[in-house]
Curated annotation (Swiss-Prot):
It comes from the Eukaryota. WD repeats lie at residues 97-138, 142-181, 210-250, 252-291. This is Aladin. It comes from Arabidopsis thaliana (Mouse-ear cress). The keyword Endoplasmic reticulum does not apply. Pfam families: Beta-prop_Aladin. Residues 49-69 are annotated as: Disordered.
Amino acid sequence: MASFPHPGSVTVCEINRDLITAQNLSDERAQETYGKVLGMVFSPVSFDSTPSSLQENEGQENGDKASGESKGLVATLQMKVADSLKQILQPTDVTLLSEIDLQGVSWHQGKHIIAFISGANQVTIRDYEDKDEKEPCILTSDSQRNVKALEWRPNGGKSLSIACRGGICIWAASYPGNMALVRSGGSALRGSLSRGSGTRWILVDFLRCQNDEQISALSWSPCGRYLASASYDSSSFTIWDVSQGAGTPIRRGLGGISMLKWSPTGDYFFAARFDGTFCLWETNTWTSEPWSLSSGSGSVTGAIWDPEGRFILISFSKSSTLGSVHFSSKPPSLDAHLLPVELPEIASLTGCEGIEKIAWDASGERLAVSYKGGDENYKGLIAIYDTRRTPIVSASLVGFIRGPGENPKALSFSFHDKFKQGPLLSVCWSTGFCCTYPLIFRSHVLP
C-alpha cells in the first residue's frame, strides 16, 4: 500500500518503500531515520518565497517605456511592430511558462552542492561538504536579472550557469589554489556579489543574447564544452562554445521554445515548444525529426532521458500518462517510436488533471511526479514511483511526499545524479524551504 503523509505532517525520507514522516522539520528526526546510515544530514535551506515576479515585470515594462522614449519615434514604432509580430507568432508563450518544468534546482554532478533559485534575481548555493559553512551563499549581480533556470557545468569544477534576461551568467568557485578566471574578452561584469561564510563565487562570464531576450531554458552537453540555451521569445535555440563565448543559433519551425534536454551520451538533443510539438535532434549533423501529438495531451511540461540515453520520458499538461520515445537504431538514427507509460493510481487517488513536473534519478529506479489539481488531501504532494526500465518502462507507486508549512506546493525539484547511497531528491517548496529527501531502499546501504 502506498505511503500517505497526513495533513500537518512533513516527509523526512524513504526507508524500503516506506516514506517516513515527522510533525515538523527537524535535524534530530533526520539523524534518527537516515543520518546514522548515510553519515550526514541534509538540513533544509530557507529562502524568501514571497512572490516578486510582479515587481520584476513592472520594472521591465517601465524600463522598456523609458527606453522607447529615449530612442525616438522611429525606434519606438519598430519596437511596437516587432512586439505585434511576436504576439501573433507566440500569443500564449508567457502564460504557458508557469506550466513548464523550468529547472529551478540543480545538484552538482560530483559534489554534495546544491543550487536553487531563491528570488527573482538571486540564486542560493548550499555546500553540504563544507563543514565550516555556517550559512548558504547568495549569488547576485547587476547582470543577473529575472532568473528562470540554472544548471551545473559537467566536468567544469564548481561552475554554475544561470539563465537570465539578456543572457547567461557563468559563476565559478574561487579559493586558494583554484582561482576563478574571467574569460578574456568577456562582457563587463558589474555588481557581482556572493554573500556567505563559505566559498567565494566569482561571475566569470556573461553570455549575452540578442535583443535582451529572456533566457528560460538551459542544457549542458555531457562533456561540458557546449551549452544550449533558448527563450520563449524566440523560435531558435543557441549552442554556445562557452570557452570562446561564441553562440550558434539553430532554428526549426515557429513558436517559442519551452525546454531543452541533451542526452547523457551527447548523441541526441530534445527541444520542446509551447504549441505541444517537439523535435529530436541527432548532434552529429544536427538533423532533426519533428513530433506532434494529439491536442488532447496538451503541451510538454517535462522531459528526462534514461541514464543510457536510449529513450526519453515526457510529461504532458492534460494527461496523467507519460510518453516514452524509444530509438529503434543506434545513433545517429532518428528512427523512434512512442510508447505510453502509465502511472498507476495517480489519477484515481488524486484526481489530477495533468502532470506538472517530473524528475528521474540516475539509476532509473525512482521517479518523482507533481501534478495539477487534486483533492484537499492530495493537493500539492509529490508522488514517488519505483520504476523498471526493462523490457519497457513500468512504474509502481511508493507513496507521496508532503512539504513543510501551510498548503505547500513544489516549485521545482531534482535528483542528485551521483549520490552513491541511493536517490537523493531535493524540492523547493512554495512555503520557503528547499528540502532534501534520501530515498533509501538498497540492502547494502541499510544495516
